[in-house]
Amino acid sequence: MARTDDDVGADSLPVGLVATTIVVAILVALVALGIADALPAVELASVDRQAGTAADDCRFLLSLAPRHLDDPGAPPGAMRIMHFDLPEGTEYLSFGFDPDTGGGHEGMIYYKVRGSKKALVVDERASFRSPDGSQTLLRSGSYDLQVEYVCDALGRRYLLVSGAQ
């Protein structure tokens, strides 16, 4: 004989729903914490990749012909437009200048992402310069920079960094 007034499971259904909801909430919280902890590493990897590409491009430029600064009629030197899309955690990306120390080697790219600082050697015999003599310092955001290889009458090599035209 079948019972139609069986309500034994009626009390366990809400308890099961609450327990499942709590477990799902805990899993979502753990995933959110994992993503928050992974964000600095992802941002650093992005800047690592972009700075490495820029250093490789600069080394390539240094293997080509420079523009001679002492000859107004000289043809343009080897030139490259570089695009940077720096993530939110980027404190700086600098060419030939270390903002933390106020100096640094002029042939290096310095960058700092969420407190993690790195430096890449481009060339020990070359220097980064800007046409107006200021320091090129980028923060988070999107940038297009023009880098041109030039040399002076004494044979000193420079990579001129300016905003792309």
Region spans (language model):
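Short, glycine/small-hydrophobic-rich surface segments
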Residues: L61-G89
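Generic detector of short, locally flexible boundary/turn motifs and exposed helical patches
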Residues: L17-T21, D48, P75-P76, D123-R125
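Membrane-proximal amphipathic alpha-helices
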Residues: P40-A51
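N-terminal alpha-helical signal peptides/signal-anchor transmembrane segments
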Residues: Q50-P66
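N-terminal single-pass transmembrane signal-anchor helix
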Residues: A2-A38
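Intrinsically disordered, low-complexity regions enriched in Pro/Ser/Thr/Gly and acidic residues
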Residues: D85-Q165
